[in-house]
């Protein structure tokens, strides 16, 4: 995610300089960009946070940042960062592309930014306007609670799976280099094998013919 953060470093520099009470929290295994070290007193680096503790951490901030550089890979990412923040009533400012652009209603239940100018303008607005910030977060929570939790959709999902169930399944992955998203896909592949399915993996690059994980062996 370093490229994603570096994309908005010029914006963060201006905001931290203009708003001395502003604090930036960076969670995850990332290095602080050199350009931001001047504002080290306003920046907290937290490192890896256990997933069970992450909602509480997101709830502790006023604005959740989700910048994404415009790449094919990022356009295929989900809107999970918006969902995670919405469920704890924290407003999200995200790049206007991919699933964010499809899911988030700009100014209604989140904030979408196309370029550096919009990032600067909209983040300063959220910093200055607490009522607007809380209203957007509240609407995001309401919509996410209705549309994005399994309590309302689990039955429909199960019915769809039963209708389309196939004991032979294929997963198409960009590569076999392990990342968060690929790891999740492989865990689902293991679940399907345990349920009796035959699973094959397809990759867009690489020469591996088999993938081995514990007791599981997948043809690639």
Protein language model regions, located:
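Short, polar loop motifs at secondary-structure junctions
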Residues: 27-34, 96-99, 204-207
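Conserved catalytic-core segment of nucleotide-activated headgroup transferases in glycan assembly
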Residues: 1-59, 184-190, 195
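Flexible glycine-rich beta->alpha loop in the catalytic core of nucleotide-sugar glycosyltransferases
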Residues: 30, 70-71, 91, 98-99, ...
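A charged, aromatic-enriched C-terminal amphipathic alpha-helix characteristic of glycosyltransferases
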Residues: 131-162
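Nucleotide-sugar-dependent
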Residues: 3, 50-57, 62-84, 93-102
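N-terminal strand-loop element at the rim of the active site
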Residues: 174-179, 197-220
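Conserved acidic donor-binding segment of nucleotide-sugar-dependent glycosyltransferases
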Residues: 106-117, 125-131
